[in-house]
Amino acid sequence: MSRSVLQGFWLLMRADKPVGSYLLLWPTLWALMIAAQGLPPWHITGIFMAGVFVMRSAGCVINDYADRKVDGKVDRTKARPLVSGVVTEKQALGLFATLVGVAFLLVLALNWQTIVLSLGALALASVYPFMKRYTHFPQVVLGAAFGWAIPMAFMAVTEAVPAIAWWLFAINVLWTVAYDTQYAMVDRNDDLQIGVKSTAVLFGQYDRLIIGLLQLSVVVMLLGMGQYLGFTLSFYVGVLLASVLFIHQQRLISGRARQACFSAFLNNNYVGMAIALGIAGHYFM
């Protein structure tokens, strides 16, 4: 296999842009710590961390495969490997299958209930890229895909998925819709021209307002979770930091400039980190 194809695989997997993996990792760590009420078993943590990278990579590959006919019409994506021809469609599908196979091998080291749940993750990752052709809410499907590690984490650690796991899952879906709408605002003009659907297209001039309401809902639900679980001050400091970051993001997207919207999207890495540190502070301080 040529070096150019390997480089194309690297780009298809977005290995050069790790923020997507971080956005998937943080909620996974939230769930693992809450499920274990502290430090989760190392082997389970390692499996989930590896699984985050592998499944995010698989999702990016199948996303580019689904978008191969339209990416050439969008400024931001017209140089992607499938568009440029560096990687063929067959090679992309082979890479996707390989990554899914690796992810399945990882999950085989967990209990059978988690293995069954993992099928939901595969289904969500596979259908998400095609949703933008049929609905304005592909971001909701992405939120479910990014959040599916939460019930899996609880099942792996406790062999059950309690109500608080689904509460945390809902928080993650709302957060994902908010930040992926910011991401979709970058491509909105191109999407309108080629008929691609997204929440950014649907929300239109109300995008900032709805993103703000989603972010407010995330904060309120986090506070409710903290009260329910009896979290200490450090968690609330983390939520406060996340709230400040949300306000900063609102300022960034105020003019709807492409680069500013993308910067707001990237800033969500620190939101996830702040919440993770808040949860860790409760359990370890």
Curated annotation (Swiss-Prot):
Keywords associated with the record: Cell inner membrane, Cell membrane, Magnesium, Membrane, Transferase, Transmembrane, Transmembrane helix, Ubiquinone biosynthesis
Catalytic activity: all-trans-octaprenyl diphosphate + 4-hydroxybenzoate = 4-hydroxy-3-(all-trans-octaprenyl)benzoate + diphosphate
UniProt-listed Gene3D superfamilies: UbiA prenyltransferase (1.20.120.1780)
Pathway: Cofactor biosynthesis; ubiquinone biosynthesis
Alphabetized Pfam families for the sequence: UbiA (PF01040)
UniProt key word Lipid metabolism: no
Membrane-spanning segments: 20-39, 92-112, 137-157, 159-179, 206-226, 228-248, 260-280
Function: Catalyzes the prenylation of para-hydroxybenzoate (PHB) with an all-trans polyprenyl group. Mediates the second step in the final reaction sequence of ubiquinone-8 (UQ-8) biosynthesis, which is the condensation of the polyisoprenoid side chain with PHB, generating the first membrane-bound Q intermediate 3-octaprenyl-4-hydroxybenzoate.
Protein name as catalogued: 4-hydroxybenzoate octaprenyltransferase
